[in-house]
């Protein structure tokens, strides 16, 4: 995966954050205009800070270890407390895959699919997300 390659993503994206990251912010939501331009500008400002791109790409670099750690944990026990999983129904929102993935790690998985939502749930469906969080945590 490109994001897992050491140093290459930083070298290619630095100075071009608007092209690379802007593409994700306009392509991964259910609607290309779901994230306001002012919000995208702020995300880009933050990712232009020293070390920010490396931190962002390092999330993906850690995935193989996370997968191994989670598999080892799931073989020994499952989380006993309720766990909430939500996935958008469109464009990299992952739908029910989120809930199904969590069922390998927890006994009581709640949640489901958020409609008209892609990858960026808090930005795309904030009211629906808040309603579900309040119901789960309340």
PLM regions with names:
Residues 119:
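Histidine-centered divalent metal-coordination motifs
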Residues 1-114, 122, 131-136:
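Flexible "cap/lid" subdomain of the alpha/beta-hydrolase fold that forms the substrate-access gate
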């Amino acid at each position: 995966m490109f994001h897992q390659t050491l140093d290459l993503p930083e070298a290619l994206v630095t100075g071009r954050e608007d092209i690379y990251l802007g593409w994700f912010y306009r392509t991964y939501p259910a609607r290309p205009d779901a994230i306001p331009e002012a919000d995208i500008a702020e995300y880009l400002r933050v990712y232009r800070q020293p070390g920010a791109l490396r931190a962002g790409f390092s999330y993906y670099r850690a995935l193989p270890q996370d997968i191994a750690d989670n598999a080892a944990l799931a073989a020994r026990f499952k989380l006993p407390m309720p766990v909430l999983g939500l996935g958008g129904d469109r464009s990299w929102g992952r739908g029910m895959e989120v809930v199904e993935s969590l069922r390998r790690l927890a006994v009581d998985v709640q949640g489901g699919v958020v409609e008209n939502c892609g990858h960026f749930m808090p930005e795309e469906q904030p009211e629906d997300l808040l309603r579900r969080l309040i119901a789960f945590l309340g």
